[in-house]
């Protein structure tokens, strides 16, 4: 299977997000990379599902709370940017303060 660097990045994000999902389901608090992967993958899937950029940006602030992550993680993530594939093309999505 031949994948572009972008496709490899997407698979890596998905794999890390799947691990984060499983750990969260077991009641573990997510660390920095897990929180980033969890939110990023959810944003990419929301875009793929046909949500608008504004809807995806808002959705990104509802995925995790401070109780879901280790101490200090929310302060380490002032914003998340991801290039997501929407029905009308690829767009840059920025979510400010994704963990309120």
From Swiss-Prot:
- The reply on keyword Lyase is no
Q: Does the keyword Cell inner membrane apply?
A: no
Q: Name the UniProt key words of this record, in alphabetical order.
A: Cytoplasm, Hydrolase
Pfam assignment, any one? Urease_gamma
Q: What class of enzyme is it?
A: hydrolase
Q: Which reaction does it catalyse?
A: urea + 2 H2O + H(+) = hydrogencarbonate + 2 NH4(+)
Identify the pathway: Nitrogen metabolism; urea degradation; CO(2) and NH(3) from urea (urease route): step 1/1
- EC number(s) on record? 3.5.1.5
Q: Which family does it belong to?
A: Belongs to the urease gamma subunit family.
Q: Subunit composition?
A: Heterotrimer of UreA (gamma), UreB (beta) and UreC (alpha) subunits. Three heterotrimers associate to form the active enzyme.
NCBIfam families for this protein: PRK13241.1, urease_gam
Q: Which PANTHER family match?
A: UREASE
> What is the protein name for this chain?
Urease subunit gamma
Where does this protein come from, organism-wise?
Answer: Burkholderia orbicola (strain MC0-3)
